A protein has these predicted regions:
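Conserved single-residue anchors adjacent to enzymatic active/cofactor-binding motifs
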Residues: 1-193
Length: 193
């Protein structure tokens, strides 16, 4: 069981590094409609310290893939953008609830609603969480969040090969790693291509 946690921490670390380095390209690649509404002339602010205070349970070993970023809309309004990367290999039943909990904590702290974006990196084509809700004695709540599934990019391989966005290469590498998980020799050959 501890092995899974270490695998997850190891997988999260490269994601966090590349997200920080190429944040704009990530949003442009995975969430182009949102990218078009952001004023990229104003520097983004990574709110790591604030996010750690809000979500002390988000640290598991070296796991820090969750990103809380302040960006500005075209026109000057500040928005909080929550990027949550789901890089674990197994679907997790409480994942939508966790995204909702993050939303509540961020809203409570900043007094403005965040945008929750999720990149699903697992290999289960059926697992596609995008909402959390409940109804109890006449009270109800429905929270929807935006997701992309890396598996879906497998059908767009030719498009990825010609893309100039660094995340096209990241996605191709991720998909090939999943495809060749048990074939180390083939994986090494593909990486050296």
């Amino acid at each position: 069981m501890a092995k899974k946690g270490n695998d997850r921490a190891d997988a999260d670390s490269p994601w966090k590094m590349i997200l920080r380095q190429y944040f704009q390209q990530a949003i442009e690649f995975f969430f182009p409609d949102i990218a078009n509404k952001i004023d990229w002339n104003i520097p983004v602010a990574f709110l790591d310290r604030e996010f750690q205070q809000l979500t002390p349970d988000s640290e598991v070993g070296k796991r820090f893939a969750d990103q809380l970023v302040r960006v500005y809309q075209k026109g000057g309004n500040s928005i909080i953008l929550l990027i949550h990367l789901e890089v674990q290999a197994e679907p997790e039943d409480i994942f939508p609830e966790r995204i909702f909990t993050y939303l509540l904590r961020i809203f409570d702290y900043f007094h403005q609603p965040p945008i929750s974006l999720v990149i699903l990196c697992d290999n289960d084509p059926e697992w596609r969480p995008d909402r959390y809700g409940f109804t109890t004695f006449g009270s109800s709540l429905q929270f929807n969040f935006t997701t992309v599934k890396l598996l879906d990019y497998a059908e767009r391989w030719e498009e990825l090969e010609v893309s100039q966005n660094v995340f096209a290469t990241v996605v191709m590498t991720h998909l090939k790693a999943q495809e060749m998980k048990r074939n180390v020799t083939r994986r090494k050959e593909w990486k050296l291509r």
